[in-house]
Design a protein with these regions (language model features):
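Alpha-helical transmembrane segments of integral membrane proteins
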Residues: 53, 82-90, 149-152, 173-177
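Membrane-embedded catalytic cores of phosphoryl/pyrophosphoryl-handling enzymes
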Residues: 115-203
C-alpha cells in the first residue's frame, strides 16, 4: 500500500515533466524554425498583410470578434439573447481552461520580439503554449458554424490563428496545438450550446 502510494506521485511528476518538455523537443523546434523562416522570407513585410494580420490578432483579444459574431448569428436566427449568452459563457469556460490550467502545464516562453513592430500589438505575459487565440477561434467556429456559413467562420479562425505566428507572439507549434485543442473542445461543447440556441444543422 505504502509502496503504491510512494510511486504514484513520482509517476505523475514524470508524466508532468514529459508533457512540459514536449514544446521544447528538437522536432518541435525544427518545425517552428521552418515555419518562421517561411513566414519571414515569403509572407511578412507587406503592408497590406501587416494590416490584416495585426488587425486579426487584435480582434481575437478576449474573443471580441467571436462575441460580436455570436450576437450577429443570434440576431439572424431570432435567438439573440440565448445565442449570445450561451456562446459567451462557453468562450469564458474555454478561456479559463486553456489560458489557465493548460498553459500552466507548459510555461513556454514566447518568441523573441524583433522590434520595432510595424504596428502596435498587445503582448500577453502568459505561457506561449498553446495559443489561446487559436483555441478560442476554432472553439467558436465549431459552435457557431452553419451549413451555409461554416466556410466564413473557419476562414476567420484560420486567419486569427495564423496571425499569432505572423506577428511573432506565438511559435507555429503553439498555433497548431491551440487550434487542435479548440476544435476538440468546440465539438464537445457544440451540442450543449446549440441545444439551447437553435437547431443543429448538419454541414
Amino acid at each position: 500500500m505504502s509502496r503504491r502510494t510512494g510511486t504514484c506521485p513520482c509517476a505523475l511528476r514524470s508524466l508532468a515533466a514529459a508533457v512540459n518538455r514536449f514544446p521544447q523537443s528538437p522536432a518541435v523546434a525544427r518545425f517552428d524554425r521552418a515555419a518562421d523562416t517561411l513566414l519571414e522570407r515569403h509572407v511578412r513585410g507587406h503592408r497590406a498583410l501587416d494590416l490584416v494580420m495585426y488587425g486579426a490578432s487584435a480582434a481575437g483579444d478576449h474573443s471580441i470578434v467571436w462575441v460580436a459574431l455570436a450576437a450577429l448569428e443570434g440576431w439572424r436566427r431570432g435567438t439573440l439573447g440565448s445565442t449570445l449568452g450561451r456562446t459567451t459563457a462557453a468562450l469564458a469556460a474555454e478561456s479559463t481552461l486553456v489560458n489557465g490550467l493548460v498553459k500552466l502545464a507548459f510555461r513556454r516562453t514566447r518568441p523573441a520580439a524583433r522590434e520595432p513592430r510595424p504596428l502596435p500589438l498587445r503582448t500577453p505575459r502568459t505561457s506561449s503554449f498553446p495559443s489561446g487565440h487559436a483555441s478560442s477561434a476554432f472553439f467558436a467556429a465549431a459552435i457557431l458554424r452553419e451549413r451555409r456559413t461554416w466556410p466564413l467562420y473557419y476562414a476567420a479562425a484560420v486567419t486569427i490563428a495564423t496571425s499569432r505566428a505572423y506577428v511573432r507572439i506565438h511559435h507555429a507549434s503553439d498555433v497548431v496545438a491551440g487550434a487542435a485543442v479548440g476544435a476538440v473542445l468546440g465539438e464537445l461543447a457544440r451540442p450543449l450550446v446549440r441545444g439551447t440556441t437553435g437547431p443543429d444543422e448538419p454541414l
